[in-house]
Amino acid sequence: MAPKKKATTAAQKDRSKALDLAMAQIEKDFGKGAIMRLGDENRPPISAIPSGNIAINVALGIGGFPRGRVVEIYGPESSGKTTVALHAIAEAQKGGGIAAFIDAEHALDPEYAKALGVDTDALLVSQPDTGEQALEIADMLVRSGAIDMVVIDSVAALTPKAEIDGEMGDSHVGLQARLMSQALRKMTSALYQTGTTAIFINQLREKIGVMFGSPETTTGGKALKFYASVRCDIRRIQALKDGQDVVGNRTRLKIVKNKVSPPFKIAEFDILYGEGISREGSILDLGVDAGIIKKSGSWFTYEGEQLGQGKEKARDFLKSNPELAEQLDDRIMQELKVGPYAKAKDEPIADEDQPIDVVPNFDDQDVEPQN
C-alpha cells in the first residue's frame, strides 16, 4: 500500500506544479488578478446605493441597489417605475456620486425629478434617436469609470435603427432582443469593474394565445432576465384619497429575482403625487412592524414621545423633524440587520440556479409576437 500512496502523492505534486505554472502564464499574458483562488482574496460585502426608501432597502436585503450589477424594474403603466429610479439617482447624488439618465422615451419631467430630490443641474441626460445610440452612450459612460449609476428608461423604447429607417408595418423579428443581448454582453464586465449600477426600466406586454398562467411578459427578449442580478415587479394596489381627491397610490414592489440576497421579499409604500415615495410613511410602517414605534389606537409613539394621531399627522411630524426620521431609519435597519448591519448568514445566496421569474411563462419566448 505504501508505494501506491507515494505514487499518488507524487502525482498530486506534479498536478499542483502544473497548475501553478499555468496560473503564472495566465497572469503573465492577461495581467495580475486574471485568475485566482476564491479564498485568496478577502472580498468586502457587496456595496449598495440606497433606494431612498427603507421598505425597498429592506426588501433588497443589502440596503439598496447593488453596485456593479444590472437591475431591472418592470410593471404596468404609471406604477412608479421611473419614480423608484429617480429616487435611487437622488441617493447616488447625495452620496457624492454622478448619475446618468438615458431618456429613450423622451418623457423625463425635470420639475418632477427636482421634487424627488434629484440635482437636475448635475444629472447627465441623453435623449437618443435609436436603441443602438442609447446603449452605446450608456456603455461609454460606464467604461469611463466616472459615474455611479445609469438609468435606461425604457427597454421598450430602445428602437433598433433598422426599424426607424424602415417603413411602417415592416416586420423586424428579434432585432430588439439581439440588440439587448449584445449590449448586455459588453456592459456586464464593465459594470463590475467600475462599480456602476445599471437600472433598466421595462414595460409589460401580453402574449397572444396563452391559456394557462399569466400572459404577461417583458420586452427586449430573454437576455435582460438572465443578466439582471435584481428584478423588481412594481404594481399599484390602492388609491390614496384625501376626501374625494386621489392624492397618491399604495404601491407594492416584489423582488422576483435577487442574486445578492434571498429573493421574493415584498415592499409596500405610498407614492404621493408631486412628492414621490413617502419616506416617512415607510418608516412608520416598518417601525410599527419592528416594535420600535408603538401604535395605540390611532396614536403613534416613539420612546414616550407622541408622533401624532393618525398616519398623516405622524408623517407630517417626521417631515418637520428630519433628524428623528433619520434616527428611526437607522434604528430600523439595525433592528432588521439590513445593509451595513447585516451579519454573515449561513444560508446560500441565490445565484445562477435560482428561478429567473416568479411566473414561469415570462421566459417562454425571446421575441414578442408581431401584431
UniProtKB/Swiss-Prot annotation:
One of its GO terms (molecular function) is damaged DNA binding. Pfam families: RecA, RecA_C. Keywords: ATP-binding, Cytoplasm, DNA damage, DNA recombination, DNA repair, DNA-binding, Nucleotide-binding, SOS response. ATP binds at G75, P76, E77, S78, S79, G80, K81, T82. InterPro entries: AAA+_ATPase (IPR003593), DNA_recomb/repair_RecA (IPR013765), DNA_recomb/repair_RecA_CS (IPR020584), P-loop_NTPase (IPR027417), RecA-like_C (IPR049261), RecA-like_N (IPR049428), RecA_ATP-bd (IPR020588), RecA_C_sf (IPR023400). Residues 343-371 are annotated as: Disordered. It is found in: Cytoplasm. One of its GO terms (cellular component) is cytosol. One of its GO terms (biological process) is SOS response. NCBIfam families: tigrfam_recA. Can catalyze the hydrolysis of ATP in the presence of single-stranded DNA, the ATP-dependent uptake of single-stranded DNA by duplex DNA, and the ATP-dependent hybridization of homologous single-stranded DNAs. It interacts with LexA causing its activation and leading to its autocatalytic cleavage. Belongs to the RecA family. This is Protein RecA.
